[in-house]
C-alpha cells in the first residue's frame, strides 16, 4: 500500500495576503436579486410620460341604427339611452336567430349554417308579416352580395 500523505491544516490568510482575484471579488457590490419576469420596472426617464391605454374595440350597431333612422325619418333624432336599447334589441334578435339556425343545422346533420337555415330561423323566430319582410330583404341582400 502507498503511504498516506499527511494533511496540513489550511492556514488562514489575511486580506493583504490573499490573491488579487479574491480582492476584486470582495470589492464588488453584493449580487442583487433579479426582478421576476412579470414585474419589469419602467425606465426612470419614461416615468414622466403617461402610458396610453389601448381601448377595447366594442362592436355596436349604433351607426347602422342611426343610418336607418335617417333613411326612414330624417328629421328625428335618438337619445343615447334609446340607442343602447336598440343595440341590445338587435344583439338579442341575432342571438336568437343564431341559436335557431344552429339547431336546424344540427337536426339536419349538416356541419354548416347556410342561408336556408337562416331563412327558416327567421320564419320561426319573427312573427307573421315581420318575417315575410325580413325574408324578402334578406334574399335581396344575398343576391346583391353574390352578384357583385
From Swiss-Prot:
Residues bearing N,N,N-trimethylalanine are 2
Q: At what sequence positions does the UniProt record place the cross-link Glycyl lysine isopeptide (Lys-Gly) (interchain with G-Cter in ubiquitin)?
A: 144
After translation, the protein is modified as follows: Can be acetylated to form H2BK6ac, H2BK33ac and H2BK34ac. Mono-, di- or trimethylated at the N-terminus to form H2BA1me1/2/3. H2BA1me2 may be acetylated to form H2BA1me2K6ac.
MF terms per GO, please?
Answer: DNA binding; protein heterodimerization activity; structural constituent of chromatin
List residues modified as N-methylalanine. Answer: 2
Its GO CC terms are: chloroplast; extracellular region; nucleosome; nucleus
Localization: Nucleus; Chromosome
Keyword hit for DNA-binding? yes
Primary location group: nucleus
Q: Which residues carry this modification: N6,N6-dimethyllysine?
A: 13
Instruction: Extract the InterPro entries matched here.
Output: Histone-fold (IPR009072), Histone_H2A/H2B/H3 (IPR007125), Histone_H2B (IPR000558), HISTONE_H2B_site (IPR055333)
Regarding protein family, the annotation reads:
Belongs to the histone H2B family.
Q: What is this protein called in UniProt?
A: Histone H2B.1
Output the lineage of the source organism: Eukaryota, Viridiplantae, Streptophyta, Embryophyta, Tracheophyta
Amino acid at each position: 500500500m502507498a503511504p498516506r500523505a499527511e494533511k496540513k491544516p489550511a492556514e488562514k490568510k489575511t486580506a493583504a495576503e490573499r490573491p488579487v482575484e479574491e480582492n476584486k471579488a470582495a470589492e464588488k457590490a453584493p449580487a442583487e436579486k433579479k426582478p421576476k419576469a412579470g414585474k419589469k420596472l419602467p425606465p426612470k426617464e419614461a416615468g414622466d410620460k403617461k402610458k396610453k391605454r389601448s381601448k377595447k374595440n366594442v362592436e355596436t350597431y349604433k351607426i347602422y341604427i342611426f343610418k336607418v333612422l335617417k333613411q326612414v325619418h330624417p328629421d328625428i333624432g335618438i337619445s343615447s339611452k334609446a340607442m343602447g336599447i336598440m343595440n341590445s334589441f338587435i344583439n338579442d334578435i341575432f342571438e336568437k336567430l343564431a341559436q335557431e339556425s344552429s339547431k336546424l343545422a344540427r337536426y339536419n346533420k349538416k356541419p354548416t349554417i347556410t342561408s336556408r337555415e337562416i331563412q327558416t330561423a327567421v320564419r320561426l323566430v319573427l312573427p307573421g308579416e315581420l318575417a315575410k319582410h325580413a325574408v324578402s330583404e334578406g334574399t335581396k341582400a344575398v343576391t346583391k352580395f353574390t352578384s357583385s
